[in-house]
């Protein structure tokens, strides 16, 4: 099983754990606004790392961003497969075609 799927399983388990026992459980307990704030913070840190041109720092911050995005997905009843399906749908489609397809529904 790949890391994203294992993480998704663990994040599902954390939904039922005590907030003082798990960082992810504490995020779930604090609610959507806290999760969204963390994603914003991690996205900003990723942008700064990229601007600084430090590959190791970019990967580190991107891992934090992906983690918090996975928390959001789980909180919303979604998972990595939902995102991977959407990426698969877009694969081979130009960016302009994809953008136009959003207008169609």
UniProtKB/Swiss-Prot annotation:
* Enzymatic class: hydrolase
Q: Hydrolase among the record's keywords?
A: yes
Q: Where in the cell is it found?
A: Cytoplasm
- Pathway per the UniProt entry: Amino-acid biosynthesis; L-histidine biosynthesis; L-histidine from 5-phospho-alpha-D-ribose 1-diphosphate: step 2/9
Pfam family name, one: PRA-PH
- Catalytic activities: 1-(5-phospho-beta-D-ribosyl)-ATP + H2O = 1-(5-phospho-beta-D-ribosyl)-5'-AMP + diphosphate + H(+)
UniProt keywords (A-Z) are:
Amino-acid biosynthesis, ATP-binding, Cytoplasm, Histidine biosynthesis, Hydrolase, Nucleotide-binding
Instruction: Mention one GO molecular function.
Output: ATP binding
Classification via CDD domains: NTP-PPase_HisIE_like
In which broad location class does this protein mainly occur, judging by the first location in its UniProt entry?
cytoplasm
Does the keyword section mention Membrane? no
Return the EC number.
Answer: 3.6.1.31
What GO cellular component entries does it have?
A: cytoplasm
- Return one Gene Ontology term, BP aspect: L-histidine biosynthetic process
Q: Give the family from UniProt.
A: Belongs to the PRA-PH family.
Q: What is this protein called?
A: Phosphoribosyl-ATP pyrophosphatase
């Amino acid at each position: 099983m790949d890391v994203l799927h294992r993480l998704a399983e663990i994040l599902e388990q954390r939904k039922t754990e005590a907030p003082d026992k798990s960082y992810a459980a504490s995020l779930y307990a604090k609610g959507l606004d806290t999760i969204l704030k963390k994603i914003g913070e991690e996205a900003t840190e990723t942008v700064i790392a990229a601007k600084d041109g430090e590959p190791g720092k970019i990967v580190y911050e991107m891992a934090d961003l992906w983690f918090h995005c996975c928390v959001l997905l789980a909180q919303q009843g979604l998972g990595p497969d939902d995102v991977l399906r959407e990426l698969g749908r877009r694969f081979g489609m130009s960016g302009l075609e994809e953008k136009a397809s959003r207008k169609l529904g």
